[in-house]
Every structure is written in structure tokens, then in C-alpha cells.
């Protein structure tokens, strides 16, 4: 049975919206990237939502692009963890002059839900991304990428909105639409590796301590769905995906969605991101396809080891 994310996880969606918004109607200028790499500027009306009063993250301060962003990685020492029989999450954040380096054992910080035929085991993730990323002349498609596109601030790999070739009746389908993800937007793969295809800023998922919930492999930060409208981030708005469902996402998800920003308020670009008030690019995790990253706006850093591996097919 296929379950709409908007219905099945409405509680999580409302929690996501409760991270900050402008309380009064207003107008804002939203600058975004097209697939050709050109910037477009539109005026978007900011309207109040029916969501509960917004909560500002405990750490509302945001690092300047180029600073070592250790402050946005949450303290995981007191989290529940995957379960008594599993290792606790371990995440190490370091920076060189040019790179952000994150090492993780890949263990979720919340209870593991066995939704696939695969188990859950510790991994040896090491991600290296540019500390001072720049927007590329053209965007890079991720439609054929089956593997890591980034990582969360809790040390988990981020995959695209596409599952692998197994099960065959859902080959390369939308894992959110097909209902094969847990309440935090993840599941385990063939190598017993936990990864996220979607991100939800729920307290349970330990992604509420900062507006930034992850980083893409091109180095740009991934925010939750709330976007800053000024440099100090004292004014915010909820941003949404620009993709419409135009086909059946059960299989080949990229054939089932079409980008269309017409008539939408606070819509993101085709990469699911935008240029913020400080002039730098950022992605946003959204409740709708492509959920996290729609394409790379910058140049992805070549990874090594496990981080460079493609996503193997699911068992069974």
C-alpha cells in the first residue's frame, strides 16, 4: 500500500513547519538557481501558516560559510541510540584550511526500525567537503546517482529520492511514496548501512538543535524547511519544493515529477535550494520530492572509501 507522506506523517510535517516563520504577511525576494546555473529573482509573498507557533532552535546562530561549523552538530552523548544491542552513534567533526571532515560510525541516534530485509551494523564513514564551496557554472544532475549525496549533522549518509533496483516492482522508485522509510526518513541498505532519503526536523530525530541539518558533498549546508530572510535569521519563512507529481512514483521516481515554480510561494529551485540573504547557497529539506537535494549547485568533492561506493540493491 502506498502512503502519502503528507497524510501518514502529518505530525512530523507540522513539527518541521514549527521551526520558524514570519508571523505577518510580507514580501521577500527569493534568489535561486536554474539548471543552467543562472540566477533568477522572484518576489514571494510570505504568509502565516496554520502550524503551531514556531520554535527557534536552541542554537540559532549560524556559522559563516568558510568557518568550521562544529556548532551545528548536535551533542549525541545523551541520545537514546538505535537500541541496547547496537553501538551508540559516534561523530567526529574536524576542519582543515580547505575542508570539513566528518567521521561517523553511521549509527542512528534513535530507535532502529527494521523496515527492510537488511540488518544494522556500524560503518566507517569519512566525508570530506569543501569548507568554502562556490556555485558552479551549471548544476549537476543526481538523477542517476545511487549513493551518498551528503550527510546529516548526526552522522548519517544522505541519499537521493530514488531507491535501488530491488524490489523489482519498485525499481528506482520514490522510497517516501512507497512507504519504506522510518519516521526519520531512513532505512538500512544491503550492507546493513543506515541512510536517509528524507529528513525531518523532529525532536525524536535529533535534528532540532540548529537550522542546519546536514551538508551536501558540494560543501553547501542543508537547512530544514525554514529559511532565513535576513542575515541574522531573525525573520524566517517556510520554503517548499517546486516539483509536482505528474506520474506514478512507484518506480523511476524522476519520471514521475516535474519542476514547476509557477504560482507557488517561497518555492525552492530545481536543486531544492536557494541563495540566502548573505549571498551564499543552501539546500532545504522539504516534505515533498526531492526531499533533500534535487541536483548539485556546486562541485561535489570526490569521496574515498565507503563514502565513494554506490548504493547496492536491497536484499530480497
Enumerate the language-model features and the residues they cover:
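C-terminal motif of bacterial Sec signal peptides marking the signal peptidase cleavage site
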Residues: 15-18
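Long, compositionally biased interface segments
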Residues: 37, 52-56, 249-316
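Extracellular/lumenal glycan-associated surfaces
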Residues: 154-156, 190-203, 277-290
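Short helix-loop boundary/capping segments
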Residues: 177, 199-252
Amino acid at each position: 500500500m502506498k502512503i502519502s507522506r503528507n497524510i501518514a506523517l502529518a505530525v512530523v510535517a507540522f513539527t518541521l513547519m514549527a521551526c520558524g516563520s514570519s508571523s505577518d504577511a510580507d514580501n521577500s525576494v527569493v534568489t535561486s538557481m536554474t539548471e543552467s546555473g543562472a540566477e533568477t529573482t522572484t518576489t514571494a509573498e510570505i504568509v502565516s501558516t496554520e502550524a503551531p507557533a514556531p520554535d527557534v532552535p536552541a542554537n540559532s546562530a549560524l556559522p559563516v560559510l568558510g568557518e568550521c561549523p562544529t556548532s551545528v552538530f548536535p551533542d549525541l552523548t545523551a541520545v537514546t541510540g538505535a537500541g541496547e544491542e547496537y553501538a551508540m552513534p559516534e561523530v567526529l567533526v574536524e576542519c582543515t584550511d580547505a575542508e570539513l571532515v566528518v567521521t561517523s560510525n553511521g549509527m542512528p541516534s534513535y530507535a532502529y526500525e527494521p523496515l527492510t530485509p537488511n540488518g544494522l551494523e556500524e560503518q566507517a564513514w569519512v566525508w570530506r567537503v569543501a569548507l568554502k564551496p562556490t556555485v558552479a557554472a551549471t548544476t549537476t544532475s543526481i538523477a542517476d546517482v545511487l549513493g551518498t549525496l551528503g550527510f546529516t549533522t548526526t552522522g548519517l549518509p544522505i541519499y537521493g529520492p530514488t531507491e535501488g533496483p530491488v524490489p523489482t516492482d519498485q525499481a528506482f522508485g520514490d522510497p517516501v511514496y512507497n512507504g519504506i522509510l522510518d519516521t526519520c526518513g531512513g532505512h538500512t541498505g544491503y550492507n546493513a548501512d543506515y541512510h536517509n532519503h528524507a529528513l525531518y526536523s523532529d525532536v525524536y530525530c535529533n535534528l532540532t538543535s540548529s537550522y542546519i541539518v546536514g551538508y551536501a558533498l558540494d560543501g553547501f549546508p542543508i537547512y530544514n524547511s525554514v529559511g532565513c530572510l535576513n542575515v541574522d535569521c531573525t525573520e524566517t519563512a517556510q520554503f517548499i519544493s517546486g516539483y509536482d507529481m505528474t506520474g506514478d512514483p512507484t518506480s523511476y521516481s524522476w519520471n514521475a515529477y516535474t519542476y514547476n515554480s509557477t504560482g507557488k510561494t517561497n518555492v525552492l529551485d530545481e536543486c531544492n535550494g536557494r541563495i540566502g540573504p548573505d549571498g551564499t547557497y543552501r539546500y532545504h529539506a522539504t516534505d515533498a520530492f526531492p526531499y533533500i537535494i534535487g541536483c548539485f549547485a556546486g562541485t561535489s568533492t570526490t569521496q574515498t572509501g565507503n563514502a565513494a561506493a554506490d548504493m547496492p540493491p536491497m536484499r530480497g
